[in-house]
Amino acid sequence: CMSLIFVLALTGAAFLAIPMILAAGAIPVIFPVSILLLPVLIIVIVYGIAWSAYLVLAQSDRPPYAMIGPPSLSKYIPFVPFSPLRCLKVAKIVCEFIWLGARSMRSFWYWYSLYRTQKNSPEYETVLYSLPFSHNCLDIYPPDVGVVSQNAIVLMIVPTSFFPSFISCNRKLYMPMALRMRKLGYCVVVPDISYYPACQIPQSVVDLRLALSWVGAHIFSYKGDPSRIYVMGMGISSELVALTLVQEAAVMSRVVRRQDDENQDPSSEEELDRLKFNKLMEIYAPQVRLPSLAGVVLAAGMSDVIKCYLHNVEMGTEHLGMLRRWAGPRQYQCIIHSPTHLLNNTKDKFDPAFLPSNFLLIHGGRDKFVPISQAALLQSLLMEVGVKNVELFACRDLGHYDTLKMLLAYPPTHSDSCRYDTPMMKALCSFLV
């Protein structure tokens, strides 16, 4: 904490010193000194921004190579970067994130006004869904009575996680989209899901399985049709949704075709690797039964943890994000928690009957945090294993957060969003049938 305060104070002082140095540079005698001091201040600011980000986001569960000195002392030594290139990359990402936050103020006020209205006269009901395992809740938005009276299509929106996680994971953040879909006649469910640092991916999968199981058993009481349940993931929750479904389908396919594996001679090295991989696969909380799903919507989602982590390495943000610490940290854990790796390693024995028959993938062409190649790879593998309907809705000019904001039904902030808002909602509603 003291290190962070010191770095922030030093960075702030450098920011304040720049205009004074520029003003003093107008004096001929001080001009050479100001020319020399200006690059120094810029370097201090770049390092200060990068170190502040590391001190806030990168200290917990740091990688082994980041430990300095003996274990008893390393926890007291902050993990910060010294490479100028890495600091420049991190500072650039932080500045972009701050600019994104400033641009989102209009969306925040829109959400706050909606939240205050719903607080006084809520159109949803909050229910505990995970007792006795935890005290997670879910919000249920019954369909508008004027549109449909019973057996409405059910849409579960799974919250995503990005910094700050206490905001992005909050189910109330998804209220605008839930109310929008409710008015269109859908029964919407938004559950609490635990993410890092509260837990790692196995517990997140268990939370999702419990939520889906509760919806399948009780949604009829809220005018929903249990035979038409759709689940929607955004960002990192797309990885969670895809993993939960592919994991169960891969393990069930292995159980059904185990006799074939026993009769097959594992002579080749590739076959031995495949059998070892199959032994690592398991269903988290198999006693929790999933309902039959009508379809899956994955928006701006990752599907390959390894490739996404390597992409973060190129951006210089692999230590700041939660991906490795949530889905790993070891390489084999990242592999068995990647839906595309599960599909690729089990495609010869994969039975598509264990997966929903409809998938809709929504992705922005300018998404630099999760490249659109992740969606294209997942689409090709799902089609290869025999899933009947896999659609990819690509928005050429949208970035990662633009796609999420549009799906969350927040007001668009620029022309590109306006251009894609109606087609995206049409594609979503035509898929939810």
Region spans (language model):
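Glycine-rich nucleophile elbow surrounding the catalytic serine of serine-hydrolase chemistry
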Residues: 233-243
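Short, surface-exposed "cap/lid" segments of acyl-processing enzymes
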Residues: 141-180
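Short beta-strand/loop motif that positions the catalytic acidic residue
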Residues: 354-355, 360-363, 367
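N-terminal cap/lid segment of alpha/beta-hydrolase-fold proteins
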Residues: 15-25, 76-149
